[in-house]
Amino acid sequence: MLFNSVEFLIFLPIVFLLYWSMFRHTKAQNAFIVAASYLFYGWWDLRFLLLIALTTVCSYASGVFLAQYNDKENTRRIICTANIVLNLSILFVYKYFDFFADGLHALLSTFGIDSPHIRLNMVLPVGISFYTFQALSYTIDVYRRHLTPTRDIIAFFAYICFFPQLVAGPIERATNLLPQFLKPRQFTYQQASEGMRMILWGLFKKMVVADNCAVFVDSTFANYQSVDGGTLMWGGVFFAFQIYGDFSGYSDIAIGTARLFGIRLMRNFHYPYLSRDMAEFWRRWHISLNTWFVDYVYIPLGGSRHGISTTIRNVAIIFLLSGLWHGANCTFVLWGAYNALLLIILILLDKNHKHATDVAAKGHPVSSGG
């Protein structure tokens, strides 16, 4: 069920009216949000529901066990690691297994080694990268004692499957989103009008900007051999606006839809094409993903605290992972490597090496603010 579909146009007002008819009962609202979100998600494929339910139950249980063994650090470490491995294994099997299997088969064939070509050919569940990272952030934050684990399983289900941001982000943190499901929410005309403005602005970006740019982009690159260099250059410019309108448009619709239900989501894009350099660009582009990689990968690896060589290594790692996160394809890996190279050059060109290592952190802010 896409945001710009007739089905969603019917779905949203019905869910909105029924949700606010329960305004005196927070638990009932949460249960209804879960039911509506599962209907929304199951619209693509009912099989997806089993997978997201498994992720949710295991992540909820990990929080409960982490609280139960609060004074036993080794046990807590095992629980946290087990949940991370489980969630990443599910993500790997569905999204990355065939990519790495194809790569291994091609590599062995290059050296004349005959090997079976094993592929799973599994349907990729919509939004699995988003809700997996959201589930991981909960477990890690509870393990780090940045968050008290919840015993309210319905609220936790709502946190993982909240339909406005389920399939296209923003990737929310439990520290921001989960507490909003644990307290009463009041309807106000101000938040409803804010939500509608964001939805309309997002639809404009998606349907007017992105979709119209896509017509020119598709026709240009479909016949790239027969068009001149100037046209190809304009095709690249239009493609930049297409992906921005597409991605940020969906984020705006998600943020606006959440506001209709009294929920505030983080800002995901902040005029990225007005950035002065690559570091600032990555402060403004897909903020929720970039802050996730900083908090859970970059900083644990040492961040920029141990000199330029360590910083360069960590920047390369998070950008390669970011490329893989966007898609199981060599194109995305190269895209990640290209952006890593640009930021590494920026670090090396910094005149004051004492502060050069701050560039990477600036490019991927820790704050979840917009």
Give the role of each language-model region.
Residues 1-370:
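Membrane-embedded transmembrane alpha-helical bundles that form the catalytic cores
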